[in-house]
Amino acid sequence: MTSIFSSDQIRSQLSVHRIFGMASAAILYLVCLSGTVVVFHNELLRLEQPEVEETFELPAQYHAKIINEYLQRIAPQREALPETVYLVMPTQDLPRPHVTDGIDEWYLDAQGEFLQQPDTPWTEMITGLHTHLHLPHVLGSAIIGLTGVLMTALIFSGVVAHPTIFKDAFRLRRQAADRLQATDWHNRLSVWGLPFHLMIGITGAFMGISTVLVGVLAALYFDNNQEQAIAAVYGDDPVVESRSGSVDYPTALANLEQHAPAAEPIYLALHRPGQTDQLLEIAARLPDRLTYSEIYRFDADGQLINHQGLADGPIGRQVAYSTYRLHFGNFASLQVKVLYAMMGIALSMVCVYGVNIWLSRKKVQGPLRQIWQGWVWGLPAVMLLCLILSWLPASWLPLNLTATFWLLLLLVTAGSALIHRQEH
């Protein structure tokens, strides 16, 4: 197969591919493997706390009572009312309505009565690992975004550096040396999942560094006003002067059904509750659209003000609001999530085989190889061990689950090098 790139360009891209790959392999493997698990986030929430009562209904007549009771419950611990309260509706994959302001949270039954608070430390730990590496959110998200950029760069450099990668898409030298077998698997898994891997890299980069992008946009076009920059992408809130002290949720939902009959509400957000400019937003899924939701705005009387244009606004806004569902496979059936998980495992294996190729090529036999093996096998083992530990009473653990995870992973990885040292 004739390449459109010169031999010098191919050698240059191969060198770039190796440097980027070795520099980012450990974190890429961690992000890919944890992301494979996070695909089943809602299913894991249900499995980790199976005793929670489930329902597919939460009638509008109970919404005001729920919001008011929530505000009363949190008032003694707060200096001021929260800026926004979210009432999350039951869905097919998570039939557990709940109310939260991002700090406290309770599940609800079909009559709006308060049930347990969420107690899913393992799912939260894995999710935090994937989204921000348990670091402060801005820093962690920026690093995750950088891994998406590196993944995208590795995909393009890998394709350029291997002119026969598509021609040899089904070539496996099963009887060859370990390095050649690893090379074949690395290249085959890469090309088989190429569209998926590219999509994951691009969407992950976008979500991870969106905070940084907003800052750049604000600096270039909005005199460092980040709120204006966000409004330019996602739409601004309307100015509301309510005529009512209470919110008419049934009327708002009835008006939504009349305006958009196919819309499926997934959450209600009451902004500035109890104030004269309180605003009700209803986020609703639209059929056959990848956008996470469309957001419809209502005044306290339940009258429709406008919608945010996430599904029919500027194309950039539609794309930005579609990345989450596309990245996590949260747009179709469980079978799609299973397919995402299979692709995620394949992507994790690409990372592993890539490093193994380099170690074999350089004939590395010292502690570096053992540390890598400890990281590869230790990461899933520690994740499973933390799942078992999460079943124990929290008082039995000297550290929280996140700290326990990193301590165990450090011990396993470092222990691999120590074992090698003792053997030699």
Protein language model features and the residues they cover:
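Conserved histidines in hydrophobic membrane contexts and catalytic metal-binding motifs
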Residues: M1-H424
